């Protein structure tokens, strides 16, 4: 590609405010033909349309093409330089950070405190944002609303003691004036910092009011500061699952200095692990250049960096998504090699069992059962996700398919996350299967030693056909005679290792596995997150179920909530009241819950009010739930009422401080009521402070009030909070993402692309021949999480 010619051609068109461009015809077609061999799709697509665009948009497209050509030349130059450098194998970069000679002991301990253990971790610990401290604008040309650095001279200092801003510093750079505004209790002490005539550099968000340009509390630097004239990377740290800017300036600077030095000295040795054809397909920069440019960017748009849309971020994000998909597909490929028990399904028998049910199955339930039974009849292990909205009847699907497995002579293990849920499942399975001679047993941590001993004995001898339990099922003492089917409820609460340990109890055969999730996940995302599983979806509710009526109240409207609760109690119905865990300390949470419990007792003195909280032992929780079912009226709880808990008489769910929950969490809570043919209500209570219609939490809650479709709610939650919130895991932990974020629509769009590319690579190269560094990186990132040892 003759970049110099094309750049000159574009410059010529854009001269004199695009005078020649106004008269030119067929510019897009001409440039398309010149660039079609080398330019990425997004450039070519815009060139196809450019001739139809209005003049200003036409200019913008040509500037974008011009920018791409400059980057292309730069990358080519650096690419040639990299080609001459001897790259190291990737495992060299898995060495401990302590081995790096250019870092001081203090720098090493600071990096380790951020969770950086290896050289690889350090090189890929990218900044979360960038500050543009290049002095490339003036007061006149700087854009209002953007953060800018301006070199100015102090013109006047004003003290305004009784006003909102007590100190104002008027400055100029010759092109215009700007006022720096400060709010100090004692503004006189700040006078020394600003002397008339002194030169300073200010950095902050430029604002404007009635033609006056100003900044509030900007950073002030001396013109000789080493930070100036650069794009400054800003690093974050993860605290309690949240990403937060490293607030200490000293620590921020130490991290920045260490990572800049490390990336500058090592980037050229980092190997290109991706297949060449993929890099060419998307015109990606070399991964080594991404490391260099993201830690120490030179001539890149800061807006592009901060919106993660520059080419270097795009490459890293694509890589993360691609590696994750590759790991999932390899895991799926590996499981298919195992031998599973072949279940001979007696269809007539099963049809009779379905006809005997006291209710009719929905079409979606019938479809899910059919898909599962087809899988069970093969000797290839089933690995299926059963997804359904709250109350859609997943448990009955699990029970009926378990019956088919037991009738074929195999045992079933059902693992659930909590004791309360284990007891409930045990009751349901026992009730539904008692007429078929199926022995169902329960195994939880709270059984006595002799009860446990009896369960171990009967499971080993094969007398127990279905064993329901918590993670107690994966203990070494639990031995099955012939385990054929494993059902795991609420997948995300179990680690991969727990699932693996349960599946390993199959004695020579790999049991079929059904994962049930009551958390609806948009299908595209489900394929990506659970890409190693096949998916069955129950997308309709049983007939007769009424939609839960959801209403939003502010604290000042609480009386209406109490009125509704009183109405329902008079009808003989039951009420849940949920409080979020707000305090850092469990003691404070417990105190808050106890106070609320006492308050509800005073409000309803003639009613039986019970308290359930997370610190209670499981036995006590069970006792409270049983009491609530039998004779309780109101249950006040700090813990999210367990998913799957079934109290048909409960018709009201009051959720205090509802803005503190994610939408998917709220949807789970709402699903605890409306489990019969009675009208049910979900009443959300929020503080008056968030009344402002622009408040994001309020906007989210209004979406929630309008829809009861879990899949739509999940879509909304995904946009707002990312998939970690929906499936209950952090993106960095479960997915291994450092930069990719599925809450960003552009990253979600890339996810599907990465999935297709990973499928294509495995189709053509199932053992990843000649891609040693890619294999090693997969093992490093996903070896333990996804049992990918076979790739090595």
Curated annotation (Swiss-Prot):
Enzyme class: isomerase
Thermal properties: Optimum temperature is 60 degrees Celsius for unwinding of Holliday junction DNA, higher temperatures could not be tested, nor could unwinding of partial replication forks.
Residues that, per the record, bind ATP: 388-395
E.C. number: 5.6.2.4
Annotated region described as Wedge domain, given as residue ranges: 134-229
Catalytic activity: Couples ATP hydrolysis with the unwinding of duplex DNA by translocating in the 3'-5' direction; ATP + H2O = ADP + phosphate + H(+)
Ranges where the Helicase ATP-binding domain occurs: 375-538
Record-level Gene Ontology MF annotations: ATP binding; ATP hydrolysis activity; DNA binding; DNA helicase activity
Listed InterPro entries: ATP-dep_DNA_helicase_RecG, DEAD/DEAH_box_helicase_dom, Helicase_ATP-bd, Helicase_C-like, NA-bd_OB-fold, P-loop_NTPase, RecG/Mfd, RecG_dom3_C
Span of the annotated motif DEAH box: 489-492
Keyword tags: ATP-binding, DNA damage, DNA recombination, DNA repair, DNA-binding, Helicase, Hydrolase, Isomerase, Nucleotide-binding
GO process annotations (BP): DNA recombination; DNA repair
Residue ranges occupied by any Helicase C-terminal domain in the UniProt entry: 557-719
Cross-referenced Pfam families: DEAD, Helicase_C, RecG_dom3_C, RecG_wedge
This protein's domain notes: The N-terminal extension (residues 1-86) is not required for DNA-binding or HJ unwinding in vitro. The wedge domain within the N-terminus inserts into the replication fork junction, where the lagging and leading strand split.
Function: Binds and unwinds Holliday junction (HJ) and partial replication fork DNA. Plays a critical role in recombination and DNA repair. Helps process Holliday junction intermediates to mature products by catalyzing branch migration. Has replication fork regression activity, unwinds stalled or blocked replication forks to make a HJ that can be resolved. Has a DNA unwinding activity characteristic of a DNA helicase with 3'-5' polarity.
Complexes and interactors: Monomer.
Family: Belongs to the helicase family. RecG subfamily.
Protein's name according to its UniProt entry: ATP-dependent DNA helicase RecG
Annotated source species: Aquifex aeolicus (strain VF5)
Gene that specifies this protein: recG
């Amino acid at each position: 590609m003759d970049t110099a010619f094309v750049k000159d051609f574009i410059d010529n068109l854009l001269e004199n405010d695009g005078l020649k461009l106004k008269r030119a015809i067929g510019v897009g077609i001409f440039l398309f033909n010149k660039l079609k061999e080398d330019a990425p799709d997004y450039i070519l697509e815009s060139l196809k349309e450019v001739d139809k665009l209005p003049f200003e948009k036409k200019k913008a497209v040509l500037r974008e093409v011009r920018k791409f050509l400059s980057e292309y030349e730069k990358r080519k130059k650096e690419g040639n330089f990299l080609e001459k450098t001897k790259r190291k194998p990737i495992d060299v970069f898995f060495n401990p950070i302590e081995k790096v000679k250019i870092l001081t002991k203090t720098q090493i301990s600071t990096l380790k405190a951020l969770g950086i253990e290896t050289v690889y971790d350090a090189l890929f610990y990218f900044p979360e944002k960038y500050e543009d401290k290049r002095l490339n604008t003036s007061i006149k040309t700087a854009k209002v609303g953007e953060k800018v650095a301006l070199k100015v001279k102090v013109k006047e200092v004003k003290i305004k003691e009784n006003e909102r801003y007590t100190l104002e510093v008027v400055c100029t750079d010759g092109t215009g004036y700007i006022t720096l505004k400060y709010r100090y209790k004692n503004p006189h002490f700040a006078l020394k910092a600003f002397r008339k005539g002194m030169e300073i550099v200010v950095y902050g968000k430029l604002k404007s009011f009635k033609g006056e340009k100003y900044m509030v509390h900007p950073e002030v630097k001396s013109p000789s500061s080493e930070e100036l004239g650069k794009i400054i990377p800003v690093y974050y740290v993860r605290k309690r699952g949240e990403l937060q800017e490293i607030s200490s300036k000293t620590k921020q600077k130490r991290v920045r200095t260490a990572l800049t030095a490390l990336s500058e000295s090592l980037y050229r040795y980092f190997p290109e692990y991706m297949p060449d054809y993929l890099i060419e397909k998307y015109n990606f920069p070399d991964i080594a250049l991404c490391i260099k440019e993201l830690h120490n960017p030179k001539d890149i748009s800061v807006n592009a960096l901060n919106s993660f849309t520059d080419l270097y971020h795009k490459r890293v994000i694509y890589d993360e998504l691609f590696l994750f998909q590759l790991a999932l597909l390899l895991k799926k490929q590996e499981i298919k090699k195992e031998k599973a028990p072949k279940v001979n399904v007696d269809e007539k028998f099963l049809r009779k069992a379905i006809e005997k049910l006291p209710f009719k199955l929905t079409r979606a339930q019938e479809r899910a059962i059919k898909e599962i039974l087809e899988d069970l009849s093969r000797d290839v292990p089933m690995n299926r996700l059963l997804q359904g909205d709250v109350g859609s009847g997943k448990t009955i699907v699990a029970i009926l398919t378990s019956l088919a497995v037991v009738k074929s002579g195999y045992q079933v293990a059902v693992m659930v996350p909590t004791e309360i849920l284990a007891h409930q499942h045990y009751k349901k399975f026992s009730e539904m299967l008692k007429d078929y001679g199926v022995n169902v047993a329960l195994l939880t941590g709270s059984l006595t030693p002799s009860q446990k001993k009896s369960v171990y004995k009967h499971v080993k001898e094969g007398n127990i056909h279905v064993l329901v339990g918590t993670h107690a099922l994966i203990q070494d003492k639990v031995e099955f005679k012939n385990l054929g089917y494993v059902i795991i409820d609420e997948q995300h609460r179990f680690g991969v290792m727990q699932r693996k340990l349960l599946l390993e109890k199959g004695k020579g055969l790999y049991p079929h596995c059904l994962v049930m999730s009551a958390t609806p996940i948009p299908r595209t995302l489900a394929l990506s997150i659970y890409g190693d599983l096949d998916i069955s979806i129950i997308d309709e509710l049983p007939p007769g179920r009424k939609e839960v009526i959801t209403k939003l109240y502010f604290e000042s409207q609480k009386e209406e909530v109490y009125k509704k609760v009183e109405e329902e109690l008079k009808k003989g119905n039951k009420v849940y009241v949920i409080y979020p865990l707000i305090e850092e300390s469990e003691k404070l949470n417990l105190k808050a819950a106890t106070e609320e419990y006492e308050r509800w007792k005073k409000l309803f003195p003639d009613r039986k009010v019970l308290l359930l909280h997370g610190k209670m032992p499981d036995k006590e929780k069970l006792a409270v739930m049983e009491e609530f079912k039998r004779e309780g009226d109101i249950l006040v709880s700090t813990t999210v009422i367990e998913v799957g808990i079934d109290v048909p008489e409960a018709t009201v769910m009051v959720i205090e401080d509802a803005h503190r929950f994610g939408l998917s969490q709220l949807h789970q809570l709402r699903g605890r009521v409306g489990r019969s043919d009675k009208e049910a209500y979900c009443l959300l209570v929020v503080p008056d402070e968030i009344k402002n219609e622009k408040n994001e939490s309020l906007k989210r809650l209004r979406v929630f009030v309008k829809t009861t479709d879990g899949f739509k709610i999940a879509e909304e939650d995904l946009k707002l909070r990312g998939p970690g919130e929906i499936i209950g895991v952090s993106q960095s932990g479960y997915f291994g993402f450092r930069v990719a974020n599925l809450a960003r629509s552009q990253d979600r769009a890339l996810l599907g692309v990465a999935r297709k590319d990973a499928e294509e690579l495995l189709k053509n190269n199932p053992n990843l021949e000649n891609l040693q560094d890619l294999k090693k990186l997969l093992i490093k990132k996903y070896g333990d999480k996804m049992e990918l040892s076979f790739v090595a």
